[in-house]
Amino acid sequence: MVDKRESYTKEDLLASGRGELFGAKGPQLPAPNMLMMDRVIKMTETGGNFDKGYVEAELDINPDLWFFGCHFIGDPVMPGCLGLDAMWQLVGFYLGWLGGEGKGRALGVGEVKFTGQVLPSAKKVTYRIHFKRIVNRRLIMGLADGEVLVDGRLIYTANDLKVGLFQDTSAF
């Protein structure tokens, strides 16, 4: 039985990375440094732009985050692909929250737009995931649109984020 809370702490997210939150067969979040959120502040089965589910999560920004030291030297900026990965992470986390089992894998995205950046001077990144569809057959898959905001300003959008849960990834 999944503990379906509306919010999750950093410790909860770390437990997910160890396979402790959604059980041995549930999807896992990555461990640090690839875990791209510090907390989930809202999860619902309704709501969002399509009224089919909504997730909102946050990442606290500080100049000591690992990527600022290497991307780029003298011009530090959070890689856009990490924001995209965070959105995929949240789609998979939501599938586990719904009770889905399997190993989460990103399956694609329809379109991504970057209209801003995350600099070391920022305070907080907010991720918003709006679910469009959940497929619950042999393959469990989530389809969603996502937004990334920095200090309240929209900087990335992604349409048709796709994540699947697989029982066996050996042929993937």
Curated annotation (Swiss-Prot):
Record's function text: Necessary for the introduction of cis unsaturation into fatty acids. Catalyzes the dehydration of (3R)-3-hydroxydecanoyl-ACP to E-(2)-decenoyl-ACP and then its isomerization to Z-(3)-decenoyl-ACP. Can catalyze the dehydratase reaction for beta-hydroxyacyl-ACPs with saturated chain lengths up to 16:0, being most active on intermediate chain length.
Organism: Citrobacter koseri (strain ATCC BAA-895 / CDC 4225-83 / SGSC4696)
HAMAP family: FabA (MF_00405)
Subcellular localization, as worded in the UniProt entry: Cytoplasm
Encoding gene per record: fabA
The protein's name in its UniProt record: 3-hydroxydecanoyl-[acyl-carrier-protein] dehydratase
Quaternary structure (record): Homodimer.
Any coiled-coil regions, as ranges: none
Pfam family, one: FabA
Entry EC no(s): 4.2.1.59, 5.3.3.14
